[in-house]
Amino acid sequence: MTQLHFDNRLRQQLPGYQEEGARRREVRAAWSAVMPTPVAAPYLIAHSAEMAHVLGLDASEVASAAFAQVFGGNALYPGMQPWAVNYGGHQFGHWAGQLGDGRAISLGEAIGIDGGRYELQLKGAGPTPYSRGADGRAVLRSSIREFLCSESMHHLGVPTTRALSLVGTGDAVVRDMFYDGRPQREPGAIVCRVAPSFIRFGNFELPSARGDNALLRQWVDFTIARDFPELVGTAEALYADWFAQVCQRTAVMVAHWMRVGFVHGVMNTDNMSILGLTIDYGPYGWVDDYDPDWTPNTTDAQGRRYRFGTQPQVAYWNLGRLAQAMAPLFADQAPLQQGLNRFRDTYLACDRRDTAAKLGLAECRDEDLELIDALRALMRDAEMDMTLTFRGLIDLSPVHPDPAQLHDAFYDDHKRVASASQLQEWLQRYAARLQQDALSPDERRALMRLANPRYVLRNYLAQQAIDQAEQGDPSGVQELLEVMRRPYDDQSGRAAFAARRPEWARDRAGCSMLSCSS
């Protein structure tokens, strides 16, 4: 039998409801006990070998029928004590009240072989007290996307939750994918998400909004003690240091999003991790042809609140809501503003660091920010692929910069021809800057290869894997996972995974924009 050691501190140290299964309109506690709802025939589709290793699970254990039973929601390992957490949140800028884990059930906090804490959470394992009438299930397509993106982001170096397993349930789930009144039966699945903590901004917002300062303080004290043990101090000074840390980590996370071209799609405060991890992979996407106004979320198509270019500002706004929630614990609000200033300072520093790395420079001067902004404007106007453009600059000659290096980045030949002189002018500016820089050509290329991925999880690649899996063939999911394990390497025989979005995928559902239906 698999031996995992569990230390379920959240359930032990925060107030909750011990009785299982009861649905409540309003919950005045941190968590509720709940059991996963069994499924018909759980089977393993894919898993992360790295994550399994950290947890001390070997290949034979992962391949066992018992593993599929546990991570399909039909059984528990010793020490597991399932629960769902209560939280609120601001959604699309408006307070939404109590939300909670509507279809996420935490099995326990496992201690890995590295001594780290890893909360194991099933997404799609049935209803919880916070499901608000929903079935608590998830479909295969959204589960594949979450599984692949969790691991892809990790290997890109982006702070993120992880994924241990993707399990098919053998049951159908009814969903209206486009919210057009035409629901369909789809195959069900369950992802086991993994993180040191799944605590969100909304865990603090809800008790604060209700005036429950005692529970608010319990949440803060618990989070600092368990997840920020390096922080020391008392009372407001400790809380201020903690809030500044949250702001700093959030800035680092969002800067990485902007570096690799990731668009989260639903940056509600209930989808913001207190650890600065990317969490809740729904209608996300990667920027193909560069457009700062692009969002992959059909729900946000009108207002585009969560579009690519505004993600740093939205993160700052969300932190403002967290500061607002924390205000009852402070006699003086100045430390909260100082924390918000930490976000701005950290983000600007990360942006300069990433600008230098993406362009292959030893340092980022003020004029380099203008240089990269000019490139972004060119990419937008000429419909150039963001990933391919930056990757194409790696082998550019500083002596004779050749625009042909970037031909594959264009989506429209007419725009390529029309922008030729503008591109040549920019390349000359860039080449001149490289000749002034302290890095050798080899150092420059090495730096750029670590900042500019060759492979990203483009929506059309994920959709192709989904199409295969829905026909009973999981090999596409497994191969895509393998490719995304080495996103910065040139992988032999896998050029197709680095290609720009094909024309057939420009407007296809799942390849361009997605709904929140999952």
Swiss-Prot record:
Say if the entry is tagged with keyword Cell division.
no
Write down the chemical reaction(s) this protein catalyses: L-seryl-[protein] + ATP = 3-O-(5'-adenylyl)-L-seryl-[protein] + diphosphate; L-threonyl-[protein] + ATP = 3-O-(5'-adenylyl)-L-threonyl-[protein] + diphosphate; L-tyrosyl-[protein] + ATP = O-(5'-adenylyl)-L-tyrosyl-[protein] + diphosphate; L-histidyl-[protein] + UTP = N(tele)-(5'-uridylyl)-L-histidyl-[protein] + diphosphate
Summarize where ATP binds, as residue positions: 100, 102-103, 123, 135-136, 193, 200, 280
Q: Does the keyword Chloroplast apply?
A: no
EC top class, as a word:
transferase
Q: Please indicate which superkingdom the organism of origin belongs to.
A: Bacteria
* Residues annotated as binding Mg(2+): 271, 280
The enzyme's E.C. designation: 2.7.7.-, 2.7.7.108
Q: Which residues form the active site?
A: 270 (proton acceptor)
Cofactor(s) for this protein? Mg(2+); Mn(2+)
State the UniProt keywords alphabetically. Answer: ATP-binding, Magnesium, Manganese, Metal-binding, Nucleotide-binding, Nucleotidyltransferase, Transferase
Q: Which GO terms describe its molecular function?
A: AMPylase activity; ATP binding; magnesium ion binding
* Function comment: Nucleotidyltransferase involved in the post-translational modification of proteins. It can catalyze the addition of adenosine monophosphate (AMP) or uridine monophosphate (UMP) to a protein, resulting in modifications known as AMPylation and UMPylation.
Q: Which family does it belong to?
A: Belongs to the SELO family.
Protein name per Swiss-Prot or TrEMBL: Protein nucleotidyltransferase YdiU
What is the source species?
Xanthomonas oryzae pv. oryzae (strain KACC10331 / KXO85)
Q: In the record, what lineage is assigned to the organism producing the protein?
A: Bacteria, Pseudomonadati, Pseudomonadota, Gammaproteobacteria, Lysobacterales
